[in-house]
Structures are given as structure tokens and as C-alpha cells.
């Protein structure tokens, strides 16, 4: 009987340990994007112009501002109710991403960040939105 209890305790402790490590690893990688290599060097095919930036600004106001805020700091009215941190588009970390990486993130989404393929179905509109996001650098 004692041998059974020891085995049961050992198995229980092992399961608890595995669960604890998986929770820690999941928490550490929650904000990590797995971006395919082709997007890391992908260039924006839409020429930057007053029109593309203005169109991007309109799309931002409609689809992004509620979470990312007026200035793109990640402090929009919906941000406080989310259990994740919204990206700060003015940050060096965000601005260091390639246009292709940003395009992938907004197109595919992850977790609380929705995919914008259906909400902004035209690729060129999403590329124009990236031009607008670039105007937020260092604000």
C-alpha cells in the first residue's frame, strides 16, 4: 500500500512539474511571432504617397485605433480590457520590423490580434496602412 502511495505521489509531482514548465514556456512565447522567412525581406510594393498614407490613416482609425490608440502607443480604449499588451507602433522595436513582417502580422493575426485579411481584403490597402504606421515612429 505504501509503495502505491509513493508511486502515486511521484506521478502527481511529475505531472505538476510538466504542467508548470509548459505554462512558463507558453507565457514566455506568447508575444513571439513565428514569421516565415519570405516576409522578413519582403518590400512594400505600394509606393509611399500622400494618398497611400491618407488611406492608411483612414483604415487605422476604423480598424486599429480602438486597441492601439490615436498615436499608436497601444493605449486605445479597448487595450485595458485585453489580457495582452497592444503593440506600440512608435517604438524602436516595432519600427525595426520589415514592412513584410508587419504585413504578415496584420494579415494573419495572433491570439487577440485578429487577422485583417477579411476586414481589409485588398493587399494594397494593408500595405498602405504600413506606410501610415511608419509615420508614428518616435512619437
Language-model segment annotations:
Residues 1-6:
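N-terminal secretory signal peptides that target proteins for export/translocation
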Residues 11-20:
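Bacterial N-terminal signal peptides
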Residues 21-27:
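Sec/Tat signal peptide C-region and signal peptidase I cleavage site
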Residues 29-59:
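Electrostatic cytochrome c docking/interface patches
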Residues 49-73, 79, 108:
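Sequence/structural segment immediately N-terminal to covalent heme-attachment motifs in c-type
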Residues 54-61, 96-100, 121, 138-139:
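Sequence context surrounding c-type heme c attachment/ligation sites in exported
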Residues 86-100, 116-126:
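Electron-transfer interface patches adjacent to heme c in soluble/periplasmic c-type cytochromes
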Residues 105-112, 118-139:
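C-terminal capping alpha-helices of c-type cytochrome domains
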Amino acid at each position: 500500500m505504501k509503495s502505491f502511495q509513493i508511486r502515486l505521489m511521484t506521478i502527481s509531482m511529475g505531472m505538476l512539474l510538466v504542467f508548470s514548465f509548459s505554462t512558463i514556456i507558453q507565457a514566455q512565447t506568447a508575444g513571439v511571432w513565428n514569421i516565415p522567412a519570405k516576409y522578413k525581406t519582403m518590400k512594400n510594393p505600394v509606393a509611399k504617397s500622400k494618398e497611400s498614407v491618407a488611406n492608411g490613416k483612414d483604415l487605422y482609425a476604423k480598424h486599429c485605433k480602438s486597441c492601439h490608440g490615436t498615436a499608436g502607443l497601444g493605449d486605445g480604449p479597448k487595450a485595458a480590457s485585453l489580457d495582452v499588451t497592444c503593440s506600440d507602433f512608435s517604438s524602436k522595436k516595432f519600427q525595426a520590423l520589415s514592412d513584410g513582417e508587419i504585413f504578415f502580422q496584420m494579415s494573419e493575426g495572433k491570439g487577440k490580434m485578429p487577422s485583417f485579411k477579411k476586414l481589409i481584403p485588398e493587399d494594397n490597402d494593408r500595405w498602405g496602412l504600413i506606410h501610415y504606421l511608419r509615420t508614428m515612429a518616435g512619437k
